[in-house]
Amino acid sequence: MNSYRNSEPAPPIMQGSPPQMVPPKLDWDRPPWNRWAFQHIREILPTVEVWRGNGHRHRLERAEVNLDPLPVDDSMGQPTTLAGLLDETYTDGFLVLKDGKIVYERYFNGMTERTLHLSQSMAKSVTASVFGILVGRGLIDPASPVTTYLPELEATGWAGASVQHVLDMTSGVRFSEEYTDPYSDIGQVDVATGWKPVPPGSDPAFRWPSHIFELILGLKEKSRPHGAAFEYRSIETDVLAFIMERVSGKRLAQLVSEELWQKLGADESACFTVDSAGYAVADGGFNATLRDYGRFGQLILDNGGGVVPADWIEATRNGRHGPDFSPSLPEGSYRNQFWIEDPRSRALMCRGVFGQLIHIDWDTKMVVVKLSSYPNFTNVAYSVATLKTVHAIALA
């Protein structure tokens, strides 16, 4: 089925009692269902709360400017406005913080300031920020072998890999991140996490993993030496999360709550989706409000705000990889589960499929958050246009 933009009539997904249009379990993250589903994960999948605690809410002051008519280019390079680009790129929420103040905030597609939106792979950066806190306390040494903390992985492709290799996604573990192939490794992650059922008509002899750790233990092969090259593989984040749980004796959701979310001054409790073993899906299962994603970005911009170690953030901004490792980031790199847009500005980004973005820029003192529900997993033209728009906003 085709998707729909915010300017187009919306189909009655989950409307009525009982609703006539219900997202299918196999395709809830595909169009048009994802336009509803990314804001209603708790109605689709089992989740665990990331409690905000009883502390204060960090109030975001407002210094609003109407950026709707700001001239920008659309995904085809043609003139449009910011409002037009947000419509073209299936935006659910868009937030601009400048000097920690709300400059621009827009909600679409039924989203509100209290709605939790699926992060997709922005969860990796949230998880890694708490990982950095544990490193700062001396609980984890990034130079140590992964098997120091997870000895079971000695029989897997991670044998001989350092923790830093996993943080930077430069381990040599063979893993296919082919989103459209249900039998790929990432397709098996969907089944292991409980995001999807076993595909109908699948080979009865094929053994599908029942939870994430079982899948990790089954990844026996390497495709290259550890440290030889960057290759984006979501499963690396799940390995990091198991290390965090092992050294702390706490589950991931509790760690993120105690070490980050309660100290952030969040508006709302967040949540993770969980697998059948109760494991919070670190690689993409986090959900939070638009403003709370902004607060997280601002915390990173404030060099950790005394929560995440400043030296961890500085090290994160210094990633180095070869050219053209990402079609939408020709000068980019990757470090500690964050994307670096360009080595000159060293702006950090949290990115997720279907158009999720937190852009953190020290030069402009800006944080930009875009939550979306693209019709496709990735769209280079949309991503490039969005980044150009972020820079246009900085000059406005």
Residue ranges and their predicted role:
Residues A83-L86, G132, T147, Q164-L167, ...:
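Non-transmembrane alpha-helical segments in soluble domains
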Residues L82, K101-R106, P145-T148, Y183-H226, ...:
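Short, charged, amphipathic alpha-helices and their helix-cap/turn boundaries
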Residues D267-A270, E314-V367:
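Active-site Gly/Thr loop motif
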Residues F108-T112, L116, Y374-F377:
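A short acidic/small-residue loop/turn micro-motif
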Residues L118, G136-Y179, G218-E221, I235, ...:
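Active-site helix/loop module of the DD-peptidase/beta-lactamase fold
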Residues M1-T112, L139-I140, L167-D168, G172-R174, ...:
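N-terminal leader/targeting segments and the immediately adjacent pre-domain N-terminus
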